[in-house]
Amino acid sequence: MYALITDGSIAKYLSGNRGIQVGDIKYARDIYSKWTEAKRNAIGIYEVIQNDTKKKDEKYYINTDQTFTYDADAGTVTATYGDATAKAHADTTWTQDEIDAGKAPAGADTDTVAAEGLKTIRIRLVKQQAANILKNTDWYIVRKADANTAIPSAITTFRAAVRTKCAAMETAITNASNTPAIETLYTYVNTADEGDPVVVERPLGEFPELGS
């Protein structure tokens, strides 16, 4: 991404994939690939520097729009984010004022969920993961019901382990006190002692694999 500077301020933003006219002169799009940065700067075109210092994971936060700043002394154009807002970790319910104003669906009361929080969303995803894993061995259960063929003990043990891990994950998510705590559960870190081989894990853990 580029910016065109005119009279000391940003005049327009450029994608860098098409030609441009600056003043009375038309330039082909190859100025973005063949020209040096200094040469582009001389006609007022600057590559935008992305400052992602305050940008956060959009699974857990709502980032602000970027603010673009031209620094004439430094000869740079920088795009920066403001402070991100954490997404709600708990469900929000309709308020009486919203219900009275007709904003809520028919039949809703102050206990009706208006928007799901991250806890609800993440717990549902964990349940779906567990269901998808168990689905691969469901045929053993069907065969047992249809033909009374014994289910291998390894399969029984594995399926129980999946359900146990699912319950543990749900508990961890439920107990997370805020959005940063939920994010931490999913953040992979090196848990090995210094000098030992790297072991990358997340606090939430992983579902067991069959045969492991």
Specify the residue positions occupied by each region the protein language model found.
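A preference for well-ordered globular domain cores
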Residues: 1-212
